[in-house]
């Protein structure tokens, strides 16, 4: 039943200790016990993914890299567009999640999709360049997220697309045209998410905007499951390599 599956997920998110000597071990410790029930709960928890992936142009014969792509559920949001791509890579450090992704690709018959267990700050596609790089609620879980963005910049072709959807908190004094978050939002969500090693940052968007030409930006909020009184801030960013 969905309720009991949710309770198992919430146990792992809120109470189960996260152990490991490095980031890969901590990721597997966190996700290993919830991998089977991951997609249904995250579909309700992580908003904006479907809209982001459907909005991005699918270049014919192109290379798409989904960094921190986990179970590969994001790729389903490409719909028929996946068949237009030459190669899709889902890169993650959790082998439990990648196993589900590999099974998903096999079931759909997506022979051009491949899972890669690797570090998002270092891995590069064997083709040498990518047309699209996406991060879906993964930047906040990458300790060196600056390095992950710089790695994406290196692998993208000139004019290539980067697209990010994630939690965030706004700066106290944001740049002109960006949303300002109040004291509660700026001081509640960072420690709230930090218990799961998720770190919403006021610096994601300014850094992305400094490194890429902004194509589209949406700043919004949504209600989390079982937390009806609070709305969590998130953003969708699409940029182009300058």
Task: Give, region by region, the residue ranges found by the protein language model.
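C-terminal lobe and adjacent flexible extensions of AdoMet/dcAdoMet transferase-like proteins
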Residues: 236-242
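A short acidic, Gly/Pro-enriched loop at the edge of an enzyme's catalytic core
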Residues: 121-133
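A short SAM/SAH-binding and catalytic strip from SAM-dependent methyltransferases
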Residues: 131-144
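Helix-to-beta-strand junctions that scaffold the AdoMet/dcAdoMet cofactor pocket
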Residues: 83, 142-143, 156-157
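C-terminal alpha-helical "lid/dimerization" subdomain adjacent to the S-adenosyl-L-methionine
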Residues: 18-21, 25, 165-229
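Class I SAM-dependent methyltransferase SAM/SAH-binding core
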Residues: 63-122
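Conserved class I S-adenosyl-L-methionine
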Residues: 2-59, 73-77, 100, 177, ...
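A short glycine-rich, Lys/Arg-flanked "PGG" loop and its adjoining helix->strand segment in the class I
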Residues: 146-158
